Amino acid sequence: MTTASQQTSSHSTASSTSRKGNNNDATPSLKELQLANRTLGTRNAKLVEMLKASRDKLDALNEQIRALSDPPSTYGTLLELNPGGHSAEVFTSNRRMRLVVAPGVDTSQLTPGALVRLGEGQEVVEHCGFSDFGDIAVVKEFLPGGSRVVVADTMGDLRVLKIAAPLYELWSQKNVGAGDQVLVDYRAGYAFESIPKADVENLILEEIPEVSYEDIGGLHNQIEMIHDAVELPFTHPDLYRKFDLQPPKGVLLYGPPGCGKTLIAKAVAHSLAEKMGSGGESYFLNIKGPELLNKFVGETERQIRQIFDRARSIAEDGRPVIVFFDEMDAIFRTRGSGISSDLENTVVPQLLSEIDGVEDLRNVIVIGASNREEMIDPAILRPGRLDVKIRVERPDEKSAREIAELYLVDTLPLDPALVEETGDRHAAVAALIDELSSRMYAQHSDNEFVELTFVDGSREVLYYRDFASGAMIANIVDRAKKNALKRALASGQPDNHGVSLEDVRTAVDQEFAENDDLPNTANPDEWARISGRTGQRVTEVTVAHHNRKTTTETEATEPEGTDSGKGHTDAS
């Protein structure tokens, strides 16, 4: 009994132990649970991201569906916002309509002329700025009040339009006026903004010149003549009316190149600005003459019209305006003189009509400059058009000294030895100017330029001084300064060097040497005009190359302009 009972108890204990061991093997460990938790968390995060992306994509698709289902928008031009701001007059679909303004629209932006978007029910739902495309028109005048403007279309027909806010702002600041181009919508009846006239502006240098008469040397007589012709009518109009005098419409400055024609014209504008008392404002319209020429028929004439429209618009405010045509012979040649073109047959009459139209504008004058005055059409030069003709001569020795004084001043670095020798800096500068003028105008063999032989056998020698100009003198002074600068750099002691007499001598020689090969001997008759003996023909031009001579001679046996093979050119 005892043994059987013990066996039963032992078996029960073993069974219990066996079950306990099996339960421990089936239970996961803590690490396993943590790993499983992290895995599930990662999967859950990915699912959340995928769900969010799917939701965003679904929203985008729904938005596209809604956009595709929306009706198309209509745009119009706001004409007027009615009192209360709940309705507005809008021009749309070629008709004027009174439409409701949707709630939420900022009515402060709804200014006349604005572009607005209309909803499905033809209500104003959005302000879209101002139209940036349309037709181009030219302003004729702004009507009193600043709300309307008279413009001319491409056919010259006049229209009255209302002014949008951007253009009104320009008008109130006096930044737009007669002659300017504006963007318009003829159907809506509005002008929106000013459009730059690129095709004309690139030909015009509109400025208030800073050149005064004191900046011009050796041209006292010419300055006095242009002062009497241009400034007196502007500054004393009452006296001109009292003496029953008409101010000149134009002035022609003619003479050799580089002698100050453009400087005189600029100085006139500067002087007028100081004397007119118009806030110091004067305008100098410097026309780049050759660029006016255009291969398209009528373009040159149109640009001339626009230039004078510009001048008139500026002059209306009482400001003096000078229209300056440089190289006038390039644009307004004698009619019928063209070889392969008859452009001058239409360009010259256009200028004549514009000059004749200037008679009622007291503040506009035309100044032309040319070194080939004989090529300008005579109709332009007759009294009543370019009334005053002023020849700008080449500088003589006295004038050359005056010009040199503008460039050689005592503030420049001067040669210490020269300053010590002359006594002070003023005397040193005077010595430099004496050396420059005496060397330029010396009448000796080293300064011979060309020798002319006339048809009667007489001869005349032209020297470098006969071809002097203000530009040449300025260039010689610059050469002398550069020579001194290079010597100072080479010495390593720049403070101990300055412009010397030798620098001036070298500069004059360098300038003359560069001109040795420049004389044009192909047409000897041109030299008769240069020498002033226009009554005789030149048959031979001998060019001096220092110690060398190159001869160009004319022979009666060959046609004009042909080379005989002996260094001669026919002029008979």
From Swiss-Prot:
Chain positions covered by the region annotation Disordered: 1-30, 543-572
Entries under SMART domains matching the protein: AAA
Ranges in coiled-coil conformation: 42-70
Bias (Basic and acidic residues) ranges: 563-572
UniProt biased composition (Low complexity): 1-18
Keywords, in A-Z order: ATP-binding, Coiled coil, Nucleotide-binding
Any one GO BP annotation for this protein: proteasomal protein catabolic process
Binding site for ATP: 258-263
Pfam families: AAA, Prot_ATP_ID_OB_C, Prot_ATP_ID_OB_N
GO molecular function, a single term: ATP hydrolysis activity
GO cellular component terms listed in the entry, alphabetical order: proteasome complex
Family as reported in the entry's similarity comment: Belongs to the AAA ATPase family.
Subunit structure as annotated in this protein's UniProt entry: Homohexamer. Assembles into a hexameric ring structure.
UniProt-recorded name of the protein: AAA ATPase forming ring-shaped complexes
Organism per entry: Corynebacterium kroppenstedtii (strain DSM 44385 / JCM 11950 / CIP 105744 / CCUG 35717)
Gene expressing this chain: arc
